[in-house]
Amino acid sequence: MNADGLEEEWAPPREYEIEVGTEPLDRPARNSVGGWPYLDDGQEWPRCFCGARMALFFQLDLPDDIEFFGGEHLSVFQCAHHNDRSNPVAVDDRLVPRFWEAPQPPFPGSFWRVLLQRDPGIPEAEPEPAVRALPLALRPFVDAHGPFTMFFKVGGTAAWALYPESYRCACGAELAFVCQVPESPEFDVRPGAPVQPHGIRDDAYTLFLGSEVYLLACPLRCDPAAVLPVNQG
């Protein structure tokens, strides 16, 4: 109800489809596949449990009207040498402290990292060496959640492939939906890049074995890395 005592009309959360461009980037861009990562001061380029620097798959600025996380910068990393489904480590539905570093069986540590940063400044001096840099564009749309259709998008509500999943952060807050990636998108890589294990092609990478990916994050922002990739399909 507004200040005049009238009932306000409910509006669905804003959402944006993510479109991947075709012209390779030759300079930093905040919305990109691969490219030059934008990281907060003191935030190092994430590393896998194996010690290798993780590959930047994509990054983007979330529009200001995205629920909970508007205006923040989303970055998705995964090790080029390790490719598997994510495995939420939780007791009941509550994730363990620093769940983003927890072992991911059969691995002794984490091979992925997703960051939500408030306002990272200048980009890294060197670009992501493996994933080919391409621009991303966001356009407002409405996801009808039709059968057999899943969009690469931020905001709105998750279009679960199988069934809704929910988790609580170690801090106690229920994780909120940020982004979804459809099944088996291919991220082209540069010549000479390491071949991804269990990949689709030698010249492309996939996220989490090509599963559909749903990114859920802590709305209290207890840590920039408090983002969980949930896999289905």
Tell me what each language-model feature is.
Residues M1-G233:
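Preference for intrinsically disordered or flexible, low-complexity segments
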